Amino acid sequence: MATRRMRQGAQVASDEAEETQLTKLGQDLSKTFLNKDFADIQVKCGKKTFDCHRVILAARSCVLKTMLSSDGSEQREMEIEIVDFDAEVIFQMLQFIYTGKLDDPFYDAEDIDMATELLRAADKYELDSMKALCEKKLASFLYVENCLRVLILADSYQAFELKKDALEVINRNRKVVFKSEDWEKCVKNHPKLAVEITNMIE
C-alpha cells in the first residue's frame, strides 16, 4: 500500500511539473506575439501590418504553412496579405495562434459579429481549437429569433457542435420557427438544409 501511494504521489508530482512547464512554455511563446525580434514575415490586412514568425504560423496552421512554402509568392515577398477579413479579426486570430487564447472583447461581446468572423477565419485557416471556442460563443447567442441563421452559418462552415445546438433550439420551438420569415428564406435558399430540419422533426 505504501509503495502504491508513493508511486501515485510521484505520478501526481510529475504531472504537476509537466503542466507547469507547459504553462511556462505558453507564457514564453506568447511574449513573441507582435515582437519584432526575430520576426521574419509580415501579415498585412488593410492598413495594419503584424510582425510574425514563419515557424509559429506554419506550426499552428497547415493552411498558412502551405502559403509560406518555398513555391509560394509569399515566400519571396516575405509577407502575407489578407484581404477577406478585417484587421481586428486577423489580430485576434494571430493572438490565438501565439497564445491559444482570444482577447477579452471576444468573450465580452454582446453580438455575434466578431464570433462569426472568427469562426469563418478558423475554418479557412484550419484552426480547430479556435473554431471550437467560436462555436461555444455562438451557441450562447442562440435564440428562437436567430436559430435558423445560426444553423445556416454552422452548416456552411461545418461547425458540427453549433449545428447540433441550433437544431435542438429549432426542434423545441418548431411551431414558431416554421411560421417565421427566416424559415421561408431557408426553404428557398437552402432547400437541402430545410429538408434535413423537417426530417429531424418528423
Please place each PLM-identified region on the residue numbering.
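Eukaryotic cytosolic interaction/assembly regions at protein N-termini and domain boundaries
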Residues: 1-29, 37-39, 185, 189, ...
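A periodicity- and composition-biased signal for non-globular, repetitive helical segments
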Residues: 10-11, 60, 66, 169
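Generic alpha-helical structural element
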Residues: 14, 18, 82-83, 123, ...
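Short, functionally important structural connectors and interaction interfaces within domains
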Residues: 17, 21, 25, 30, ...
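A structural signal for well-ordered alpha-helical scaffolds and beta->alpha junctions
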Residues: 22, 86-90, 163
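Canonical BTB/POZ domain core
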Residues: 31-144
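BTB/POZ-protein C-terminal extensions
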Residues: 79, 103-120, 133-202
